[in-house]
Amino acid sequence: KMFGHPCATYEAAQTRKFKLGRTETIRSCSLESLAFCQAMQDTNATDAERYEKFQAAVTRHVKNAKEAAEGAGVDRHLFGLKRLIQQGEEPPALFRDPMNAQSGTWILSTSQISSEVFDAWGFGEVTPKGFGVAYAIKNNALTFTIMCLKKVHSASRFTFFLNEAGIELRAMHDRLNQAKSASPKL
């Protein structure tokens, strides 16, 4: 929303169930999440259409998260392959493709701890032009800590757009719930 286009997003999935496992990348940016964001910006889209796209985006995200936690993500595998390239050896075309570099430049790096005891926590951005976003899902609140380089971005501007998106999403759900409760029961 802030930039007007999707960007590479990193969210960590734990792979500790595997010996020496650490993390894998959950690829949050998907065709489904893009379709949802576009629907939210489309003044002609109905709340029902937006909700359908929201559900599709959530379903895709959950699937991606489960696959990453099961070791079926791509980023650590690609990292391993890249590390096998010998000095002086020409990297395969995949690693020379600009899209590969762009998709691994995490403009948005996120992670969460869902606990009532943490009031705030955080980490910095992983690229100079990015944001580090730590969040917690609590019983009655969502908390965010947003970090970025002051010379490049404004954390308060990011916070504005994040808050606006949350308000819009809540309003959409409220309208749908009102319409559902107002409809005649058969």
Task: Locate the predicted segments by residue.
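Acyl-CoA-dependent O-acyltransferases
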Residues: K1-L186
